[in-house]
Amino acid sequence: MRLCDRDIEAWLDCEKLVISPRPPIERINGATVDVRLGNQFRVFRGHTAAFIDLSGPKDEVSAALDRVMSDEIVLPEGEAFFLHPGELALAVTLESVTLPNDLVGWLDGRSSLARLGLMVHVTAHRIDPGWQGRIVLEFYNSGKLPLALRPGMLIGALSFEPLSGPAARPYNSRQDAKYRDQQGAVASRIDKD
């Protein structure tokens, strides 16, 4: 059962759930909390790679990822990031989220943005128990027009679901947690699998 707005507020009040900066009451709706777009992005560089063999040797996968992914792009205040049709980009939420070991989170895009072709997460919308950090967004523009995305705009909504008990292996306690405490638009670390 997902938390309702009253329960979300109660979990925030007792700091069992932490969202920083804390959302104002008008951004807590029914069963969700609105999140905003941060100012960090990452895109694919122009490259000549025919493919990336994701099951190849880890050092080759790592080298291929380094060739195709850009350095992190940090937008100055007031500037827009343009996502063109058919492009994939990584971004990050403005808010940082800390989940307790007995709560899982879910990220959903906004219907108003989806109706323009913007996918906010390609497939990864679960936020594991014990997560701490900003949430990376996997943007894809499936529409016909470029979209101007500005830091601070409403970009998605989080919902939360209590578990039957605390997780035995919460995210931030795992040694193999590839994105522990992420604060930026971190590229794929599939080579760490």
Swiss-Prot record:
Catalyzes the deamination of dCTP to dUTP. The keyword tRNA-binding does not apply. One of its GO terms (biological process) is dUMP biosynthetic process. It comes from Serratia proteamaculans (strain 568). This is dCTP deaminase. Homotrimer. Belongs to the dCTP deaminase family. Its EC number is 3.5.4.13. DCTP binds at residues 110-115, 128, 136-138, 171, 178, 182. Gene3D superfamilies: 2.70.40.10. Residues 169-193 are annotated as: Disordered. The keyword Nucleotide-binding applies. Keywords: Hydrolase, Nucleotide metabolism, Nucleotide-binding. It catalyses: dCTP + H2O + H(+) = dUTP + NH4(+).
